[in-house]
Amino acid sequence: MASNRVDLNGALRRLALTLLGAGLIGGPVCAHAANNCAWINETTAGGLLGGDAVGELSEVAGQPTVCTFTQMTAGVKRVLRVTVEIAADPHARMSEIAQGCGADAAPLTAIGNEALVCAADDRKAGLGERVVGRVRDQVFTITIASSLKNDPQLTRDVLKSRIYTAAEQVAGNLF
């Protein structure tokens, strides 16, 4: 009888260790982020947008990779969008994209090989900032925008600060 108890206790102990081991090994495989953006994660994006953000990744062959993070609060939509593409002539491609900034473009120092910042306001209602830059042969754009023109969380000054932080993060991850 004592022998059966020892065998049963040993079997239960082995089973518990096996299950624990499977949980430790299999757990990280199951616990992955829904968004696989290589340059910025949902937590960082949420901090930049002022609340929990939900990310979406779009990778289509021959097109720029796009990471879009959206944060909704009381009918206000705030979006952080990052696009990255590899260009044969990155300086020319960056210049082409930067034309959308017009005369408003200003150089951003210490971001990638070169970068510009400009307003990205929606004429109808919203407020936004955009960075266009490059790291080696990779051209990137980052836009932070709010659907509310007088957004108390993302004022023009706050947007300028946060777009710079986002640009540091993205350019750093592209190096």
What are these regions (language model features)?
Residues 31-70, 104, 147-148, 152-175:
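N-terminal "mature-domain start" segment
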Residues 30, 74-76, 89-91, 140, ...:
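Generic "edge-of-domain/loop-turn" microfeature
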Residues 48, 53-126:
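Short, solvent-exposed recognition patches
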Residues 1-13:
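N-terminal secretory signal peptides that target proteins for export/translocation
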Residues 106-175:
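A short, solvent-exposed beta-edge/loop patch
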Residues 10-11, 90, 157-159:
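Short alpha-helical segments used as structural interaction elements across diverse proteins
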Residues 15-27:
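Bacterial N-terminal signal peptides
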